Amino acid sequence: MTEITAEGNASTTTTVIDSKNGSVPKSPGKVLKRTVTEDIVTTFSSPAAWLLVIALIITWSAVAIVMFDLVDYKNFSASSIAKIGSDPLKLVRDAMEETTDWIYGFFSLLSDIISSEDEEDDDGDEDTDKGEIDEPPLRKKEIHKDKTEKQEKPERKIQTKVTHKEKEKGKEKVREKEKPEKKATHKEKIEKKEKPETKTLAKEQKKAKTAEKSEEKTKKEVKGGKQEKVKQTAAKVKEVQKTPSKPKEKEDKEKAAVSKHEQKDQYAFCRYMIDIFVHGDLKPGQSPAIPPPLPTEQASRPTPASPALEEKEGEKKKAEKKVTSETKKKEKEDIKKKSEKETAIDVEKKEPGKASETKQGTVKIAAQAAAKKDEKKEDSKKTKKPAEVEQPKGKKQEKKEKHVEPAKSPKKEHSVPSDKQVKAKTERAKEEIGAVSIKKAVPGKKEEKTTKTVEQEIRKEKSGKTSSILKDKEPIKGKEEKVPASLKEKEPETKKDEKMSKAGKEVKPKPPQLQGKKEEKPEPQIKKEAKPAISEKVQIHKQDIVKPEKTVSHGKPEEKVLKQVKAVTIEKTAKPKPTKKAEHREREPPSIKTDKPKPTPKGTSEVTESGKKKTEISEKESKEKADMKHLREEKVSTRKESLQLHNVTKAEKPARVSKDVEDVPASKKAKEGTEDVSPTKQKSPISFFQCVYLDGYNGYGFQFPFTPADRPGESSGQANSPGQKQQGQ
């Protein structure tokens, strides 16, 4: 059957082609004549066409008079003035006669043309066209001549009919006459066929060129994005850590030089684009070819706490960059892929905490397309960095050094009990605000991948930290007093980390010291892993549900902190809608905050730290499992409780603020002021971070590069976001 259908189709197509070829000699000549006459008749049958013709005649006649000086204006004007002065009525009558004669002739000619259009041929139409052009000067005499010519035209038509009869009798003569017409039609058809072919070829060439240009642009953007990321990280390093910034700047310059040499070798015409990228016109997240760097690098790579460690890492990076520069010269094609991975690794090594900010732009663009590439990169990066993963002790030491920064507030809190509560609550409020917003931004896809690794790392790190943190806290006080400025610069980063960590550890009702110490621990985890935050976020939602009543009592000094944070966010983002979202996000945490201050005893906290931390680990595991079941049921209750909290907090904020101000001494107020003002001083990193919170997130996609631990985190983050939208509305 298939063969028969194919043959039938082929036969039909061939017959159609044959019929066309056979009909070409007979019909096309006639068809062309008919189409020409019909076109002329249809066009000139409408009065608009004649109006256009008249307008053209008048305009071009005026142009000719002016261009060639056909009129003697002086004599004409003088004679006309003299005539008007002598006999004005004669001039008017003469003008009226001329115009009436011209108009009469014009309309009579129109009537003749319209009446005789059906009988006319191309020749007759040409004669009428000539008559039309000559009408105005010749007037009535030409009209009579046109009528006589029109009488001759039907005779010519009769002759043409005779020729058709002769064609039927003598086909050879007619074929000889019509052969040129056939050839013309065939040529036209061939040309028409060739034109689309040329168009298709041109389109293919254009597509190829555009594809090449797009590839080149992506390469440029990749390289330019590398340079910009390097520069941004260098600027951030200068703000936070002044000593290690010099080797990093040298590395940045080396990178820029390597990329420029490559581009000069490969693309000479790209230098202009490179200059644009160097000057920073391209935004960090615009290079589509760069997939978002993975937070697994953070887990495997500890953030440098001291300048000595950072300098060592900088030397390692330099060695890696030298190797990469040599390989780039040898293999230009392979480097385009490798350089993306290596640059992403280097940028995250320099500041994984801040690289996450730059990642936020890229995550939105290439999140979906790069998910598969991220998995491959995770495998390659894990193989490259087994030594770093095998050294948890070194990480713990660095983490201890980083715990020093958040340890300030809890230890100074021991001196004045009321101040302790105020400062702990302020820090917790800020940290929890970030935690709530980060919950919403958690990507759902990466949660599945990293749950197992996060739990194992959390257990190892916490077991090592329990014994070491108590020893570190005493020398920490002296160090913090010596270096307040540098720590204040680092506070924005530590606050972000504390937001992630405290959100998770608020689940355990324990004294604020323990919570402060616990806050110290998870900061490196969040920078390195960014994963425990999500499992902890799930616990935060439970806290919101379990402890609504205490939120009213304890969350009141914390609400003061919320106001300060709101003011900072509103100043940085002049957008009304995002601020509303931020306010709702900041108002929800009071339910979370109450979990911490329940146990106030602080002398016994140190004794029970080791036992409680072990129980906390077991509690987290059990809660993470239970979260999967309870989150859906508790979503509705959390929203209602948050609405109640808004009403309570609005009434109680002013009174609480005055009480807290009285309790806090001047020195600690100044420190809190520095904590609040520090984000304004370092506008570039923090404003970008907060803008992503407020602007970009709709509750449907993931904002941040942090890999979540569990699906419950994803479901909870998405559940809260619509609830907060309802509150905002």
From Swiss-Prot:
Biased composition (Acidic residues): 117-129
Region of interest (Disordered), residue spans: 1-28, 117-265, 281-682, 705-729
GO annotation (BP), single: cytoplasmic microtubule organization
Subcellular location: Cell membrane; Sarcoplasmic reticulum membrane
PTM notes: Phosphorylated by CaMK2. N-glycosylated.
Any one annotated GO CC term: endoplasmic reticulum
Polar residues bias locations: 8-24, 715-729
GO molecular function: protein-macromolecule adaptor activity; signaling receptor binding; transmembrane transporter binding
Keyword Ribosomal protein set for record: no
Name of one Pfam family that matches: Asp-B-Hydro_N
Keyword Cytoplasm: no
Glycosylation sites: N75, N647
Alphabetical keyword list: Cell membrane, Disease variant, Disulfide bond, Glycoprotein, Membrane, Phosphoprotein, Sarcoplasmic reticulum, Transmembrane, Transmembrane helix
Transmembrane parts of this sequence: 48-68
Lumenal side: 69-729
Residue intervals on the Cytoplasmic side: 1-47
Organism domain of life: Eukaryota
Basic and acidic residues: bias regions: 130-265, 309-357, 371-433, 444-509, 516-531, 538-562, 580-598, 609-674
Membrane topology according to the record: Single-pass type II membrane protein
Oligomeric and partner information: Homooligomer of variable subunit number; disulfide-linked. Interacts with CASQ1 and RYR1 in skeletal muscle. Interacts with CASQ2.
Disease: Cardiac arrhythmia syndrome, with or without skeletal muscle weakness: An autosomal recessive cardiac disorder characterized by stress-induced arrhythmias in infancy or early childhood. Patients present with recurrent syncope or cardiac arrest after physical activity or emotional stress. Sudden death may occur in early childhood. Some patients have muscle weakness.
Function: Contributes to the regulation of lumenal Ca2+ release via the sarcoplasmic reticulum calcium release channels RYR1 and RYR2, a key step in triggering skeletal and heart muscle contraction. Required for normal organization of the triad junction, where T-tubules and the sarcoplasmic reticulum terminal cisternae are in close contact. Required for normal skeletal muscle strength. Plays a role in excitation-contraction coupling in the heart and in regulating the rate of heart beats.
Protein name per the record: Triadin
Gene from which the chain derives: TRDN
